[in-house]
Amino acid sequence: MIKREDRRQLRLVRHKRLRKKIFGTPERPRLAVFRSEKHMYAQIIDDTKGITLVAASTVEKAMKEKLQKTWNITAAKEVGKLIAERALAKGIKEVVFDRGGFKYHGRVKALADAAREAGLKF
């Protein structure tokens, strides 16, 4: 069985390999997703300036009040909707999706699908 730290290292290797191909620009910033055991995080990043334009996560007080559990697919969908709403409010319509070395499956896929349904294009 693969130990937790080894799984983390393998994910970081995958993420590094992925980041060689994906780069966020001001016209089309990068939607970066991070999945921990208890929370989901999403940021829209302009890599040319190195700044976060929009962020959303299950750690926010409003999200915690809205959700019973912060680690399931329902929570990931809510984060996806929220990040899309905030991005559209700032005038960001297109992004490049960065899965962060995670499989495009489960919570990561749910977040991406919810963001697409809310109006983000990628």
Curated annotation (Swiss-Prot):
InterPro entries linked: Ribosomal_uL18_bac-type, Ribosomal_uL18_bac/euk
Gene name for this UniProt entry: rplR
Subunit details: Part of the 50S ribosomal subunit; part of the 5S rRNA/L5/L18/L25 subcomplex. Contacts the 5S and 23S rRNAs.
Protein name: Large ribosomal subunit protein uL18
Species for this entry: Fervidobacterium nodosum (strain ATCC 35602 / DSM 5306 / Rt17-B1)
NCBIfam families reported for this sequence: L18_bact (TIGR00060)
GO molecular function, one term: structural constituent of ribosome
Described function: This is one of the proteins that bind and probably mediate the attachment of the 5S RNA into the large ribosomal subunit, where it forms part of the central protuberance.
Keyword tags: Ribonucleoprotein, Ribosomal protein, RNA-binding, rRNA-binding
